[in-house]
UniProtKB/Swiss-Prot annotation:
InterPro entries: Kunitz_BPTI (IPR002223), Kunitz_BPTI_sf (IPR036880)
Alphabetized SUPFAM superfamilies for the sequence: BPTI-like (SSF57362)
Gene Ontology MF term list: serine-type endopeptidase inhibitor activity; toxin activity
KW Repeat (keyword) present: yes
Gene3D superfamilies per the UniProt record, alphabetical: Pancreatic trypsin inhibitor Kunitz domain
UniProt entry keywords in alphabetical sequence: Blood coagulation cascade inhibiting toxin, Cytoplasmic vesicle, Disulfide bond, Hemostasis impairing toxin, Platelet aggregation inhibiting toxin, Repeat, Secreted, Signal, Toxin
Name of the protein in its database record: Thrombin inhibitor savignin
Function statement: Tick salivary thrombin inhibitor that plays an important part in the anti-hemostatic strategy of ticks. Inhibits thrombin-induced platelet aggregation, but has no effect on ADP- or collagen-induced aggregation. Is a competitive, slow-, tight-binding inhibitor of thrombin (Ki=4.89 pM). It requires thrombin fibrinogen-binding exosite for optimal inhibition, as its affinity for thrombin lacking the exosite is much lower (Ki=22.3 nM).
Species classification: Eukaryota, Metazoa, Ecdysozoa, Arthropoda, Chelicerata
Amino acid sequence: MLFYVVITLVAGTVSGLNVRCNNPHTANCENGAKLESYFREGETCVGSPACPGEGYATKEDCQKACFPGGGDHSTNVDSSCFGQPPTSCETGAEVTYYDSGSRTCKVLQHGCPSSENAFDSEIECQVACGVSME
C-alpha cells in the first residue's frame, strides 16, 4: 500500500499538482456545451475544446497557473512552504526549501533544518508546495 501511495505522489508531481493544467480530453459534456480552453502541453499552453470548468479561459492564465514562477499555488500547498527558509550553519547538511519569491524549490548547502520550511529532498518540496517538475 505504501508503495502505491509513493508512486501516486511521484506520478502526480511529474505532471504538476495542478490537475486543471492537464487536458482531460472529455468526449461528452453536460448539455453538449464545449468551450475553447487552454491546457499545458510541453513547454506552453494550447487551446483545445473542453467542457465548461476545465482548463483556463486564456493562454496567459494557463501559463501563470501551470508553470514554475507563476500561477496559483493555492491548490494542495502545505503551510510549511511559506515559513522562514532554513539558515546556514557549519555542521549543517544540504537542505531543500521553498522560495516563495521565485516559486521554486532551492537547495541550501550547509543548512540547518530548524525551519518548518525545510525538506529532505527537492521532490518532497515540490510535492508539498505544488511546484511542477521539469
